[in-house]
């Protein structure tokens, strides 16, 4: 079996991003597939230290090569098209041959342009990792009010023949993510459990999370309603540190009101410093006591069922996870190692339950990852549905 997996590892050279996309490469290879990692966004790449985009892909290319080594990917199993049009790694002709013979072209996050050279796979699947935003784009086109960027994105989406989404609750009566005219199939983040062994060392005193405060660009609009991001939801729970006897830390990027959060008792650290490489990111999560986090407002308000890729690897590390409910609690077991909350009181109660039997909930967290998120289970289902 031949599979093309796209992603944003070089475009956003940060540890958490790399683990997300390379789990597909690693997971499919472990199922016996021959996998090509392809990255071609048609745009510039991000330089996190400078906090800006650039047409210089040299440091991003070096990062990608190192990231692929972490998962033991063969040297000839990747290709990156830089902003200047140069194809690094596997050349364009070889990429075209691989794509023509592929059983599946999996466009994760819709990150890759579908150039002529990338076509010809038996199935071309779009994987929506940002539910609500994707559907807002499609809705804008349907309503005749799309920007040029939205029109381009919608046209790209419709060039696929299978459609997967992290909106796991889509189609449920209480889910407000519009289905539109596409047959969305729910999926979830795969975790290669062998890469995330249970951390048996001493755990930190702090519950942590890693997040972006507020994305740039225009906010998504669906049905005339404008939706926000994590900044909106986080402030609903700003007083949480004053209600619990444990320390809470947020590793966050963006225009964060650090002083205001610190006044409420939050420990605020820089997200990039916790995610410079895959190893640094993994170590930060594994040294945490567990995760406490909110979701983007659009995920919550639409009852999308989105579940965090980051929470998935906290669980795999044997770290209890307490995260805001987006509708995901209808699809995952809760109450042992994994807790959903909708209100401040529920968040307080969940932290108390974990602290009352911490060792039990650590073991239960890993068990949830093994049952629900193991790469073979997730990816074999995706392959069946893609076929």
Stretches found by the model and what they are:
Residues 4-174, 275-280, 284, 300-302:
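Extended catalytic core of nucleotide-activated donor transferases of GT-like folds
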Residues 33-36, 124, 207, 246-248, ...:
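Hydrophobic anchor at the start of a short beta-strand
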Residues 39, 128, 164-167, 188, ...:
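Residues at the C-termini of beta-strands that transition into short coil/loop
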Residues 117-132, 179-198, 317-319:
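P-loop/Walker A phosphate-binding loop and immediately adjacent motor/lid segment at beta-alpha junctions
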Residues 171-290, 298:
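Conserved catalytic-core segment of nucleotide-activated headgroup transferases in glycan assembly
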């Amino acid at each position: 079996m031949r599979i093309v997996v796209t992603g944003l590892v070089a475009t956003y050279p940060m540890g958490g991003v790399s683990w997300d996309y390379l789990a597909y490469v690693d997971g499919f290879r472990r199922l016996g597939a021959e996998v090509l990692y392809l990255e071609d966004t048609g745009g510039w790449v991000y330089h996190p230290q400078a906090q800006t985009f650039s047409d210089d892909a040299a440091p991003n290319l070096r990062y990608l090569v190192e990231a692929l080594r972490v998962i033991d990917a063969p040297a000839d199993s990747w290709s990156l098209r830089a902003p200047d049009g140069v194809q690094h790694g596997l050349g364009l002709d070889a990429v075209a041959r691989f794509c023509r013979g592929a059983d599946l072209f999996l466009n994760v996050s819709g990150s890759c342009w579908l150039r002529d050279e990338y076509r010809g796979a038996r199935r071309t699947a779009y994987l929506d990792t940002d539910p609500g935003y994707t559907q807002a784009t499609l809705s804008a086109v349907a309503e005749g009010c799309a920007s040029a960027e939205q029109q381009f994105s919608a046209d790209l989406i419709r060039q696929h023949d299978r459609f997967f989404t992290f909106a796991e609750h889509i189609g449920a009566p209480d889910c407000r993510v519009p289905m539109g005219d596409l047959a969305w199939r729910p999926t979830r983040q795969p975790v290669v459990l062998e890469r995330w062994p249970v951390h048996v060392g001493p755990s930190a005193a702090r519950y942590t999370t890693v997040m972006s405060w507020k994305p740039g660009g225009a906010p998504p609009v669906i049905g005339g309603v404008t939706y926000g991001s994590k900044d909106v939801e986080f402030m609903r729970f700003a007083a949480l540190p004053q209600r619990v006897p444990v320390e809470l830390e947020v590793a966050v990027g963006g225009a964060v009101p650090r002083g205001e959060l610190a006044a409420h008792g939050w420990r605020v650290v820089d997200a990039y410093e916790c995610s410079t490489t895959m190893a640094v990111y993994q170590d930060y999560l594994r040294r945490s006591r567990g995760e406490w986090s909110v979701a983007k407002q659009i995920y919550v308000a639409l009852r999308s069922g989105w579940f965090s890729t980051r929470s998935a690897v906290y669980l795999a590390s044997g770290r209890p996870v307490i995260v805001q409910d987006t509708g995901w609690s209808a699809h995952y077991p809760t109450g042992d190692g994994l807790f959903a909350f909708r209100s401040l009181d529920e968040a307080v109660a969940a932290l108390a339950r974990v602290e009352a039997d911490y060792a039990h909930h650590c073991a239960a967290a890993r068990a949830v990852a093994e049952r629900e998120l193991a790469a073979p289970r997730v990816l074999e289902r995706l392959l069946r549905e893609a076929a």
